[in-house]
């Protein structure tokens, strides 16, 4: 609310950055790093954003995550493209023959991908 990082944020960033140095392709570390830096220093997560979607191409939310960075740094075309892939990944999963109850994911995350796609398209 005041624009300041919460206590422990610097330490958390150290751990995430250490994890990324040890394994730059760790999808969890990149995912949480994007969330951790997107508001104030999105440029710090560009490298993670550029590799994350390919690490788990069938996981719509993970595929979408680079858009959090691309939108913040003005990479509108990349945000459009990545969200198209995220929407497709979700459709493949949820429209498949063994679809579980989508619950919260379908209500929130699937629409979130569409919202980001729309925002990027409007800004492009």
Regions found by a protein language model. Name each.
Residues 6, 39-40, 73, 124:
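Structural motif corresponding to the intra-repeat A-B loop/turn of tetratricopeptide repeats
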Residues 9, 42-43, 76:
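TPR-repeat structural position
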Residues 17, 21, 50, 54, ...:
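Amphipathic alpha-helical segments of tetratricopeptide repeats
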Residues 25-27, 59, 93, 110:
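Residue-level recognition of tetratricopeptide repeat
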Residues 30-33, 63-66, 109-110, 114-117:
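TPR repeat positional signature
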Residues 36-37, 70, 121:
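Residue at a conserved register position within TPR or TPR-like alpha-solenoid repeats
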Residues 92-108:
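Acidic, Ser/Thr-rich low-complexity linear motifs
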């Amino acid at each position: 609310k005041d624009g300041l990082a919460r206590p422990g944020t610097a330490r958390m960033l150290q751990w995430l950055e250490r994890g990324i140095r040890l394994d730059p392709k760790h999808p969890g570390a990149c995912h949480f790093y994007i969330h951790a830096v997107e508001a104030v220093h999105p440029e710090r997560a560009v490298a993670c954003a550029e590799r994350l979607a390919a690490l788990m191409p069938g996981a719509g939310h993970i595929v979408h995550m680079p858009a959090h960075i691309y939108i913040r740094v003005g990479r509108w075309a990349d945000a459009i493209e990545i969200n198209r892939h995220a929407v497709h990944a979700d459709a493949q999963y949820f429209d498949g023959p063994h679809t579980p109850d989508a619950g919260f994911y379908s209500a929130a995350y699937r629409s979130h991908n569409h919202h980001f796609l729309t925002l990027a398209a409007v800004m492009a």
